[in-house]
């Protein structure tokens, strides 16, 4: 049985995008229950809130109203190689990001580092791993990545396109099977166990491979090392029951993740698909303190958008329409508009209908001074310097119930994980890095173990699991 990345990869990283609140304050959202006005934004995990809840992953279908979610920054053609420590440091902590995509091309929750000319994504002992997301959205294009997966039963690596209404195009790699990458797709989160296909390569852990997804209005093609391994035609996805094409068709972010599909807290079917219970006493855990995967390069070619797309704005300059916006909660391709509206929030209490971003000097963090220090990738500004008044979003670290377990172990002195230890002995001076950089691994641990989020973790996990079965 095959299970969706939506329900499990992101369930395993439940707290990565939105604010964790006390269990008594948690408000859920679904097709039968929309968010209230004071917590108007429905996260992709079915939890209502403000601030970061209204950014990437905000589901317009179940939010308070259509304007609760912020516009989605538009992606241009780019190429990025993580071939230096500075490139990895440009990846911004999710908790520092409030929607200004000129500030960073990538955000992360969990643990990232630089090693051997690559971005190293990590999953420490008894944690839920790491998610790296683009800050911009692609609406049709060709996306490719050169990577080495993790390994061992229960360990899952993923490279996906994922939209806010839960359209999804995947490459997934289960660690017990290193020769059969899985391609997959979903439309608006609808589970279909027949969508997955296997391909054949040599060892995905030992060797770099190039994986591509070529997404157009009419078809999706998957490639490995330049060879086409699968084609999906839109016409073959017609659903007579719903009277629509079950085909990914909405603007999507690029995401990489490393997560414990075989964690004992997961459903039995998830554990079986992932290759059994994860071994938290493995050689990698003993030697390094974490499982890991390498991302060497990522690139995207943005295709022309559909000719009949509507415009939300008065400008006659195409370049001013820098973001996508929905005009209906149906969430189909015909409901996508281009807009000139800002994509960032002024504070973590802001929402799409009250963004608090009228000040032209506002960035993703209100009351801060921003200075451009470098350029790279798909955006003009990828590295910034901010003053001490910087305000961060209430986004918790990349952990759930498993992290709470790790916290308990840490208090007894048995958890000796050092996220900056690096594979092969690379050690980074985390004390000298800024908390907004990917090199701040010690800060990431501090965030991960923050006592203020633990009270909401268990409730969030339970709600996420319940939402899957409903």
Swiss-Prot record:
Chitin binds at residues 172, 259, 270. It catalyses: Random endo-hydrolysis of N-acetyl-beta-D-glucosaminide (1->4)-beta-linkages in chitin and chitodextrins. Keywords: Cell wall, Cell wall biogenesis/degradation, Disulfide bond, Glycoprotein, Glycosidase, Glycosyltransferase, GPI-anchor, Hydrolase, Lipoprotein, Membrane, Secreted, Signal, Transferase, Virulence. Its main location: secreted. GO terms for molecular function: glycosyltransferase activity; hydrolase activity, hydrolyzing O-glycosyl compounds. Induction: Up-regulated by heat stress, calcineurin, micafungin, and fluconazole. Protein abundance is increased at pH 4 compared to pH 7. Expression is also regulated by RCH1. Glycans are attached at residues 65, 100, 125, 177, 194, 198, 202, 235, 239, 314, 327, 450. Belongs to the glycosyl hydrolase 16 family. CRH1 subfamily. This is Crh-like protein UTR2. It comes from Candida albicans (strain SC5314 / ATCC MYA-2876). The gene is UTR2.
